[in-house]
Amino acid sequence: SNGLINQAKRQAEVNIASIRESVMERGLPVLGTSSTCTFTLRDEYPHLLGIDTSDVRDSVELATRYIYRLLESGKAKLRFRKDAPKVKVAYHTPCHMEKLGWSYYSIELLKMIPSVELTVLDSQCCGIAGTYGFKKENYETSQAIGEGLFRQIEATGCDVVATDCETCKWQIEMS
């Protein structure tokens, strides 16, 4: 997003080489905890940088999707404390999760937690757009873009906001 194409391409090549080693040689999945990073590895490297990821693309997935699929297949089970305090959670779907179509997995995992009272927020951009909202000259615009989301969060009376994107998390915390 800052025009450093050559540096980005070199880093992407290093990343994909490491991913290929994990996937092709060791048979391991590659799990991301960031929707943006996962989307970049799977879809943006080929699209923006011309780096072929087709041989490993399907082995790169979001951790919540991976965990959900383990639970659904019976390969893992969840246990919860019976005395856990109730927590009101508002879930924000990041823009890249919309693109991946994977918000379902995070939402369903949150629903599995008995002590969670979940509110799924209407899908709205938080305004951060990677590093865009961190730049002084873009701050006001970034906040204006996210204003509707921030109002939604306040209206829920939630204790916690959950999201699958660290930059969305930072924007929400700052606002």
Annotated model-derived regions:
Residues S1-S175:
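Iron-sulfur cluster-binding electron-transfer modules in prokaryotic oxidoreductases
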